[in-house]
Amino acid sequence: VAIDPVEKKPLAEWHPGSRVLSVGSYGCNMRCPFCQNFEISQEGASGVPWREVSPQELVDLALDCAERDSGVIGIAYTYNEPLVGWEYVRDCSMLAHKAGLANVLVSNGCASAQVIEALAPFVDAANIDLKCFSAEGYRDLGGSLEDVRHTIAVLGTSETCHLEVTTLAVPGVSDSEDAMRKEAAWLASVNEKIVLHVTRFFPRWHMTDAQPTPVATVMRLADVAREYLPHVHVGNC
């Protein structure tokens, strides 16, 4: 649990300068070899320090933070993959809305249609990781491109949710200009107001022998995306 600027989620175009109470746990439903936070996402209960916080306790904590800091506007479900415990996110989000707090979801988007449609009414802003734009690539990572596309389509067309999407430009996985062109065109077909982040990969977890993505590659992919989307940002450069 920590207070973070919204830009750290990252959310570049939603309540800039504001802060959220960020909460996370352990575990993930994907196994990306390039995971940037594998220390918690790939661990179980015995691998990380944790404590139980009820939904009401979390909302009360957020309200206390907001009372002491007017810049705190809500709760972000983040760090590991929040949807592995989606019922907790749902219960917290419902209570947060009743208390006048905003909800931010930072997720890989790999969840069933029923889960996303149950959560969508309570999500005010989201950043969804779009790991690559290949069904085969997603299978290699233990996920489903179809599920992630559905999540993006639901949140991207919601009248109450601001959506940003992040693609980490991993060498040999998601650094193809052709794939980025297809991805950006599809995102624009959902909603051209979707904000896209193209971020630079650094060696992590099972890809420590890889080289960081060249900055020029990230910039080139962002330029390709801008052919379709007006709101494109680069990160880690």
What are these regions (language model features)?
Residues V1-G24, F38-Q42, C65, D69:
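N-terminal [4Fe-4S]-dependent radical SAM core
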Residues C32-N37, G44-G47, E87-Y88, I116:
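Short, conserved acidic/polar surface loops in the N-terminal third of protein domains
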Residues Y26-N29, E52, Q56, L145, ...:
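Electropositive phosphate-/nucleotide-binding environments in soluble metabolic enzymes
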Residues Y26, G47-V48, D64, Y79:
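N-terminal export/assembly segments and adjacent metallocofactor-ligating motifs
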Residues G24-C35, E81:
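Cysteine-centered iron-sulfur cluster-binding motifs in ferredoxin-type domains/subunits
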